[in-house]
């Protein structure tokens, strides 16, 4: 009896790990798109996390800040330091190149979304 429970428990655990890994892969591709969408105007990191969370996109600082630096190094974002208050804040905004990339990515995302939605609807029939 214990062996059966252990086997079922391990299967469930493995399935949960698989689901978590696949969910992370889905999010990894979507997060830069979400960040570019949200940076149409200057925002600092902490405020951006709040707005993303409000929009339904959970992201922690350990994910966001490396992504912001990477997107900036790719020329998709611009940043500036603003000192007004207790401490300086680095503000980010989408660059002209970032707007072009966002327009292309948006089209790709919509196309992919339609295809996946169609495939899911076929399964549900």
At which residue positions do the language-model features occur?
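Alpha-helical DNA-recognition elements
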Residues: 70
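Amphipathic alpha-helical dimerization/coiled-coil segments
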Residues: 3, 103-125
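Generic recognition of well-ordered alpha-helical segments
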Residues: 50, 96, 111-114
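Short beta-strand/turn micro-motifs at beta-sheet edges
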Residues: 20-24, 79-81
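Short, intrinsically disordered or compositionally biased N-terminal tails of bacterial proteins
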Residues: 1-21
């Amino acid at each position: 009896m214990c062996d059966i429970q252990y086997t079922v428990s391990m299967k469930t655990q493995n399935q949960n790990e698989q689901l978590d890994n696949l969910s992370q892969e889905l999010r990894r591709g979507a997060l830069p798109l979400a960040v570019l969408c949200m940076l149409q105007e200057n925002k600092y990191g902490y405020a951006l996390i709040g707005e993303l969370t409000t929009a339904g996109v959970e992201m922690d600082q350990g994910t966001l800040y490396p992504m912001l630096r990477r997107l900036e190094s790719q020329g998709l974002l611009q940043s500036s330091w603003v000192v007004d208050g207790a401490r300086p804040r680095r503000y980010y905004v989408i660059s002209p190149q970032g707007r072009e990339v966002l327009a292309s990515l948006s089209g790709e995302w919509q196309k992919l979304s339609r295809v996946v939605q169609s495939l899911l609807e076929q399964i549900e029939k």
